Amino acid sequence: MNTDIETLKREVKHLPPLARKRAERELGLPVAPAGEHKVFVYGTLLTGEGNARWARDARRQRAWTTGTIYAIGCGFPAFEPKGTTHVVGEVLTADDEAFASMDRLEGYPRLYRREKIRCYLEGGGCVSAWVYVMNRLPDGAKPIECGDWRKFRRGIG
């Protein structure tokens, strides 16, 4: 029975958040409590940036991860988990509604996909969090060497 539950969990984990919760309930799977979605943000969803309102009720913690952040020429960055740059961001702890809103904003799954990464919290500690990764980097995407979207936008990085 335990194997069957694990198989079902794997089959529904890639559904959008609200559909996943509904499927978990209908299948009788253990449901994670609301507000347990950790998401690493590195661009316009950061505190004070243009799209922060999409997750205004999420708890925010300063954090970093390794990878590569790109300027793609359209007012928002892209992230690739491959790379060794210290990428500055925040880990948001979001409820189902905020998580679904972020999925819509990011064009999940058409424009961006979600991947789990390891994030390091300011002040210590490490968490696993989702990150939005662009499915295909546009031609001309340029790595942001400083790894910090805000500094890059201000011309400091």
Where are the regions a protein language model picked out?
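Glycine-aromatic micro-motifs
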Residues: 2-157
